[in-house]
């Protein structure tokens, strides 16, 4: 099946694909079927299409042995692919740090810009995208607050931006499933729900925080009520498993990014070349490095004449610049990540079949019996928080959820609370890490971690507590429906959400608050007006003037993606899917709900 990012040659959705036009108003200049629902097919959001090739027949001893061996090999392959997938994410993060850390340091040094809330938000987003690590971005903020380079009030928008920027990883992972229309629809919608939740929370809490400083005051109250004592480090289970492999590829000096911000040392390399010393240390004890190179980081202060130990990784002693190594690691890690994702998806489709698939889906997506069904989502939040806490990485957890959504194991309604729990889990990890800070920076580190925690907790109260306000779910479905037919929309979404729109807002904020209000105010008002008109078109068209009851009076390119799709398809050498490919699916027994229901355990 071709991996296409161009538009599909199927009935094209208009703006109704994202909920902006009433489907009953088909005189708007375009026509099409309900987004996300194939002709004569099933809705990929509500029905998983895991393939079942099992035959209900008696098998002999040799066949049973073959099945056992095959199942064991598939399980080993799945675990191995998952391991290298996680390692590739770690190396990808290192690559982004090598490519963008110096730029991130330069951005953070402009204190005048950081005092602007909108600029602070954008800086948090861009820096987290550049370094691919919310932990690194948070540690930078903590260091700046502790060194008095940044006030706690100015750090709040940056923390919000860090929360938004970390959702790009799952979106990038979903792109690897663009070869299959239904899988990409579910995977991209699942990754988008995380980013939509973060952006909606920012849109509500940033103005509120700017007006009332609610999060800052709440964190101060929590600090006043607690008796803080420096604690131990947070558990590091996942790193303990992946470090033996990733440290053979690359090792970075994590202190260089922070030191480049709090001081003027900007010429140090992020790559760790020296891991320690042979012989006696200044304290009189000998020091040796193990094969992974994990030992005391004193390479920055070592003099050339000392007998130093070279680290054991591919780029130790290399004369390549950080930028060159970053590009090499970026290309290699992306290649390994895509290969591992393809293997994971194929193995999941092979393993999760028939009764096994139904049992797994039932357990993961099941609700408690009435009247306690509402507790299922909150249990999922706790599970997401706990697993993220154990993995020590929200990016790894969310990136692992996306392929499972693509193959239909986890539905969007269950993945949403898992993502919310992941947000909480990463803040509790940051809180434990803050408690391990030195005494002089303990209060600042804990307050920043508490602000991050209360921000995500407020987001859950806003967009999950009341079921009717769970807006990220329908919005994510609309995005998934749209990208399923126009794959280039996924790239546009990535560029707009994490790069172009933040940079545009950043540029306007540099010109001053009045310029930002003069330009951004009318644009925001226009967007809100369009949303209001489209909601009324869908539900109360009689309330609108006749001219506004449809968008037929506008040029086609203003209310339909079809002209844009023709432009992109003509300019880009992507092969589109054909109508026959999309509509030629045959309903097998494993795609029949009645047959599956009869095979339930």
UniProtKB/Swiss-Prot annotation:
InterPro entries: Na/Pi_transpt
Reactions the enzyme catalyzes: 2 Na(+)(out) + phosphate(out) = 2 Na(+)(in) + phosphate(in)
Entry comment describing in which tissues the protein is expressed: Highly expressed in the kidney. Not found in any of the other tested tissues.
Keyword Transport: yes
Residue numbers bearing the Phosphoserine modification: 4
Positions bearing carbohydrate: 210, 264, 267, 299
Disulfide bonds: 275-311
GO cellular component: apical plasma membrane; brush border; brush border membrane; vesicle
Topology of this chain in the membrane: Multi-pass membrane protein
Ranges per topology, Extracellular: 97-110, 209-324, 391-447, 509-512
GO biological process: intracellular phosphate ion homeostasis; phosphate ion transport; response to magnesium ion; response to nutrient levels; sodium ion transport; sodium-dependent phosphate transport
Subcellular location: Apical cell membrane
Coiled coil: none
Cited Pfam families: Na_Pi_cotrans
Annotated family: Belongs to the SLC34A transporter family.
Protein name: Sodium-dependent phosphate transport protein 2C
């Amino acid at each position: 099946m071709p991996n296409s990012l161009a538009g599909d040659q199927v009935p094209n959705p208009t703006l109704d694909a994202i909920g902006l036009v009433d489907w009953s108003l088909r005189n708007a200049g375009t026509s099409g079927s309900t987004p996300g629902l194939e002709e004569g097919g099933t809705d990929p959001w509500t029905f998983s299409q895991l393939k079942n090739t099992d035959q209900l027949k008696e098998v002999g001893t040799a066949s049973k042995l073959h099945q056992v061996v095959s199942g064991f090999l598939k399980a080993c392959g799945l675990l191995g692919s998952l391991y290298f997938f996680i390692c590739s994410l770690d190396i990808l993060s290192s690559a982004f740090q090598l490519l963008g850390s110096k730029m991130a340091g330069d951005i953070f040094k402009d204190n005048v810009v950081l005092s602007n809330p909108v600029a602070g938000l954008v800086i948090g987003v861009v820096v987290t995208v550049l370094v691919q690590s919310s932990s690194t971005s948070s540690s930078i903020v903590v260091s700046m607050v502790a060194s008095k380079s940044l006030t706690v009030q100015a750090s709040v928008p940056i923390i919000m931006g860090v929360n938004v920027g970390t959702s790009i990883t799952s979106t990038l992972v979903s792109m690897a499933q663009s070869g299959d229309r239904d899988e990409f629809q579910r995977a991209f919608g699942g990754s988008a729900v995380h980013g939509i939740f973060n952006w909606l929370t920012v849109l509500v809490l940033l103005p509120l925080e700017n007006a009332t400083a609610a999060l800052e005051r709440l964190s101060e109250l929590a600090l006043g009520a607690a008796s803080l004592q420096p604690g131990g480090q947070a558990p590091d289970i996942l790193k303990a498993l992946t470090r033996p492999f990733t440290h053979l590829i690359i090792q970075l000096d994590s202190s260089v990014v922070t030191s480049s911000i709090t001081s003027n040392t900007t010429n140090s390399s992020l790559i760790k070349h020296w891991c320690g010393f042979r012989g006696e240390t200044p304290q009189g004890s000998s020091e040796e490095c193990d094969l992974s190179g994990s030992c005391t980081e004193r390479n920055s202060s070592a003099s050339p004449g000392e007998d130093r130990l070279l680290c054991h990784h591919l780029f130790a002693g290399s004369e390549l610049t950080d930028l060159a190594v970053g590009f090499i690691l970026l290309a290699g890690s992306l290649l390994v990540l895509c290969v591992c994702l393809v293997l994971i998806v194929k193995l999941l489709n092979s393993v999760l079949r028939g009764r096994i698939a139904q049992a797994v889906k039932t357990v993961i997506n099941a609700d408690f019996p009435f009247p306690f069904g509402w507790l299922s989502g909150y249990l999922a939040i706790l599970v997401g928080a706990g697993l993220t806490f154990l993995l020590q990485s929200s990016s790894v957890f969310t990136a692992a959820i996306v392929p499972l959504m693509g193959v239909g194991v986890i539905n969007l309604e269950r993945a949403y609370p898992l993502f919310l729990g992941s947000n909480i889990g990463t803040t509790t990890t940051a809180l434990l890490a803050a408690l391990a800070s030195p005494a002089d920076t303990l209060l600042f580190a804990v307050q920043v971690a508490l602000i991050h925690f209360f921000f995500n907790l407020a987001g859950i109260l806003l967009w999950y507590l009341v079921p009717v306000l769970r807006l990220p779910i329908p919005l994510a479905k609309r995005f998934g429906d749209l990208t399923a037919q126009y794959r280039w929309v996924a790239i546009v979404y990535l560029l707009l959400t994490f790069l172009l729109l933040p940079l545009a807002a950043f540029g306007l904020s540099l010109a001053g608050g009045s310029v930002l209000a003069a330009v951004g105010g009318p644009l925001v008002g226009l967007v809100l007006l369009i949303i209001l008109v489209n909601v009324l078109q869908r539900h109360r068209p009689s309330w609108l003037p006749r001219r506004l009851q449809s968008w037929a009076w506008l040029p086609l390119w203003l209310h339909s993606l079809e002209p844009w799709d023709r432009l992109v398809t003509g300019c880009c050498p992507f092969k589109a899917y054909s109508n026959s490919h999309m509509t030629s699916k045959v309903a097998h027994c494993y795609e029949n709900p009645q047959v599956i229901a009869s095979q339930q355990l």
